[in-house]
Amino acid sequence: MKIIGEIPFFSTNLGNAYLGDSLELLPKIPDKTIDLICTSPPFALLRQKAYGNVHADEYVEWFMQFAGEFARILKPKGSLIVDIGGTWVKGFPTRSLYHYELVLELCKPIAEGGKGFYLAQELYWYNPAKLPTPAEWVTVRRERVKDAVNTVWWLSLDPHPKANNRGVLKPYSEQCH
């Protein structure tokens, strides 16, 4: 798929990749033309990063500007995959619920102000190389264990998105027979 008026950053026989501000590029993509959107937006971390990240209290509103475009460009059975890490509540050894709030808002019906997505499945990316943060609760006070998991949300505008699990199935072990 080509974006009219834009030069791909690189191309393969599988498609094109574009480099730019997604809020400027997304409106140039025709309606209902994309099968899969896979994104890992900046997480709502406690410390501000050079690449820019939004505070957890503002995250849902910030993400919704992208979500509207995602819903517009996805094919009816297309999928939106969002890899999003958790964060902590400042000053407390408790987790923020911002990524759950985001999924609830994405899955809220359009008539109620949401985007009308369905949650097909939540997956988990285990990353043992993640730093032990926040240090105060993990390495200093030792009240929490290291967070080594990101949630990967699989959403679709249809309860039956285009999918086929045959490429990831593993044979059952002898113990299961």
Tell where the protein language model's regions lie, with residue ranges.
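Core catalytic lobe of class I
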Residues: 2-177
